[in-house]
């Protein structure tokens, strides 16, 4: 298995397979970051696609001051935030009341419980303000340091610490109910 530096070097030379192998290592967490920020599967897919394209296009700008994964998560987060901002500016279209429903096969009680926990977490996260939610997701899901989040959010380190602390406290309070 090749290390990130070797794959990055080949990707910078235009090797698409090396790029695919490199981003595949981090794609799951980047997807989670996009999903938590956009709160919508379709928007998360769009944000991740934008992040992949932007990462490929800007490989030459990666300076190596952080790990590649951290840089990729930051691009994914930026893409998700930009998409959310864009969606807020658009006029909402009324959904068809009949809608489309996905029926999940009842395979196990554990699966249902996991879905319920996921739904509770998603609902609770929606009740946290956007900056705090983003900081929490970047710290807990993407594994960014507080300093990296501060740079990403253009905020002080203490502001990021406060955001994450308050987000965790509010999340715990909401999940206790």
Please annotate each region the language model reported.
Residues 22, 26, 30, 51, ...:
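Residue-level preference for hydrophobic side chains embedded in well-ordered alpha helices
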Residues 12-13, 39, 50-67, 86-88:
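Sigma70-family region 2
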Residues 12-21, 31-50, 177:
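Short, charged helix-capping/linker segments at alpha-helix termini
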Residues 1, 82, 90-118, 145:
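Internal acidic/polar
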Residues 81, 124, 132, 141, ...:
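DNA-recognition helix of helix-turn-helix
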Residues 51, 75, 136, 149-150, ...:
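Hydrophobic positions on the alpha-helical face of helix-turn-helix-like DNA-binding modules
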Residues 30, 34, 59, 72, ...:
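Hydrophobic-face residues of short alpha-helical interaction/recognition segments
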Residues 25-28, 36-37, 137-144:
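Short helix-capping/turn signature of helix-turn-helix
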């Amino acid at each position: 298995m090749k290390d990130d530096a070797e794959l990055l070097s080949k990707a910078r030379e235009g090797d698409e397979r090396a790029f695919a192998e490199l981003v595949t290592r981090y794609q799951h967490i980047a997807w989670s970051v996009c999903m938590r920020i956009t709160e919508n599967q379709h928007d998360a897919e769009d944000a991740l696609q934008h992040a992949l394209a932007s990462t490929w296009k800007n490989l030459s700008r990666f300076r190596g001051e952080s790990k590649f994964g951290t840089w990729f998560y930051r691009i994914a987060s930026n893409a998700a935030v930009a998409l959310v901002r864009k969606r807020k500016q658009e006029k909402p279209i009324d959904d068809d009341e009949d809608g489309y429903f996905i029926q999940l096969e009842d395979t196990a009680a554990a699966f249902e419980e996991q879905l319920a926990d996921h739904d509770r977490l998603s609902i609770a996260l929606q009740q946290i303000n956007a900056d705090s939610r983003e900081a929490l997701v970047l710290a807990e899901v993407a594994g960014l340091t507080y300093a990296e989040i501060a740079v990403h959010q253009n905020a002080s380190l203490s502001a990021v610490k406060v955001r994450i602390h308050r987000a965790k406290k509010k999340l715990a309070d909401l999940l206790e109910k």
